[in-house]
């Protein structure tokens, strides 16, 4: 199946690598290059580094609604778009592929919708979390669920360790999901069917959030 992959950090690279081994990645979308550090040197995203190393078609739009970028995506004629740790997509983008656009999220949705699901699972003292694949819709992290995988949060596990574990578990889950979609075997569950009580939230982490009340 032809796939366009969208992602930025190291977390996304494991998924791109896994997908590239079993499906045709016809395009990779990542953030535009930015200057960073004291020397203000250009730094590539981890996903860009992987795309270059593996000779994959690379796109780095400044604006996702740019007409030229949208047309290039359409010309790639991908069956499916896959999103891992990227920006919120406008409908004009996620509506392009015939089989839809899916996202990998680092929680067991509908819990921990938002930007920092791993952090909040640790902060709240959860003993389990996981990853979810779902179809992207207008509202962020609310689309129909396709697959989930659960992972234990051990007593002394930190966010970095949880990140690394979910990075690979999530990549395997994503390939499983793509295979199901390719074979016409994907069965979805609306998130509304899973909400029985107040759901946990995962807003962006700020400095104030990190203050400890001794």
Predicted regions and their residues:
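N-terminal Rossmann-like dinucleotide-binding module
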Residues: 1-39
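A residue-level signal for conserved active-site and pocket-lining positions in enzyme catalytic cores
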Residues: 7, 28, 51, 81, ...
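Short, structured coil segments at secondary-structure junctions
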Residues: 21, 54, 96-97
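N-terminal glycine-/serine-/threonine-rich beta1-alpha1-beta2 phosphate-ribose binding loop
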Residues: 35-79
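Residues at secondary-structure transition points
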Residues: 38-42, 113, 157
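Alpha-helical oligomerization interface recognition
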Residues: 62-132, 136-138, 142
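Active-site-proximal loop/hinge segments within enzyme catalytic domains
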Residues: 138-214
């Amino acid at each position: 199946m032809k796939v366009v992959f969208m992602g930025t950090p190291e977390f996304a690279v494991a998924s791109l690598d896994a997908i590239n081994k079993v499906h045709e990645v016809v395009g990779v979308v990542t953030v535009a290059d930015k200057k960073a550090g004291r020397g203000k040197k250009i730094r590539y995203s981890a996903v860009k580094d992987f795309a270059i190393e593996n000779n994959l078609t690379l796109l780095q739009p400044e604006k996702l609604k740019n007409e030229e970028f949208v047309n290039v995506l359409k010309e790639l004629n991908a069956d499916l778009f896959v999103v891992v740790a990227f920006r919120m997509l406008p409908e004009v983008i996620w509506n392009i592929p015939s089989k839809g656009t899916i996202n990998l999220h680092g929680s067991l949705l509908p819990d921990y919708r938002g930007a920092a699901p791993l952090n909040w699972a640790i902060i709240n003292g959860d003993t389990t979390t996981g990853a979810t694949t779902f179809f992207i819709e207008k509202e962020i992290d609310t689309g129909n669920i396709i697959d989930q995988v659960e992972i234990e949060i051990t007593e002394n596990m930190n966010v970095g360790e949880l990140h690394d574990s979910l990075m690979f578990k999530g990549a395997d889950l994503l390939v499983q999901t793509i295979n199901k979609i390719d074979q016409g075997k994907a069965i979805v569950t609306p998130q509304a069917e899973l909400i029985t009580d107040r759901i946990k939230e995962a807003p962006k982490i700020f400095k104030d959030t990190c203050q400890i009340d001794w």
